[in-house]
Amino acid sequence: MIKKLEINNFKSFEQVDLELNNFTLLAGKNSMGKTSVIQAIFAMIQNGNNPFRGEYMNIGKVNELQNAITGNGEIKIKLEYEINDSIEVVEKKITKTESITTKSFEGIKVIYCSSDRIGVEDTYRKYLGDEIIIGKNCDYAFHYLNAHDEDRLDEEKDFVYDTESKLTFGGQVDYWLNKIMGYRVKAKEIEKTEFIQVLYSNEKVPFGMRPKNVGTGVTYITEIIIAALACKENDLLIIENPEIHLHPSGQAEL
């Protein structure tokens, strides 16, 4: 778990210290720095002379990202996190020519649901690697659901809110999707293809409905639920704009 984040001379932040917790919600007007906080964390994960270009983000050259008030000083990001009951501290200093890190940010797996996550489709791609991932745009969330649908959960160890619900991965996805949006979901392999078909149902319509025939927000919230339930101990889940396509009532339930 990330406990503290210090940001200096980065974008709108001249200097800021943030205390983070198991669950941290960033809220505010546009251009207030919410995404910049996420980008600062990614800068600690990505390597190279310009850590602002890589797998999780590509936001430009260092001189474009330095705070306009402080000028051309170095960008400094310091991160304190807890893993396996130990506190680790990582600091990175970034200039136009190099990036110097005190130590690498290790041991924490990141699951990132970007604001550009995939939405309503007729079919969704399978992940072709060995261990199925969610993907930063939730590209493979429904393949993950298909693969782990019947995985049994332990109510003592796993995140189970209602022990009367079905104690499988898919059962918990359905529990939360029904609680928030009033739907259930099924992800099925399309034989002899590299694609997954997704069907929704509810109490009024028990047969499968295509994603295009239900509200757009249903698909977006389903991806978030899958990503959240896929997390293991010590994982870091980052969701950008979780409220996309949700009615205010759905936002409140989320």
Regions found by a protein language model. Give the residues of each.
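Switch/communication elements of ASCE P-loop NTPase nucleotide-binding domains
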Residues: M1-F52, Y175, I190-L254
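Phosphate-coordinating catalytic segments in nucleotide- and nucleic-acid-processing enzymes
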Residues: N47-A227, K232-E233
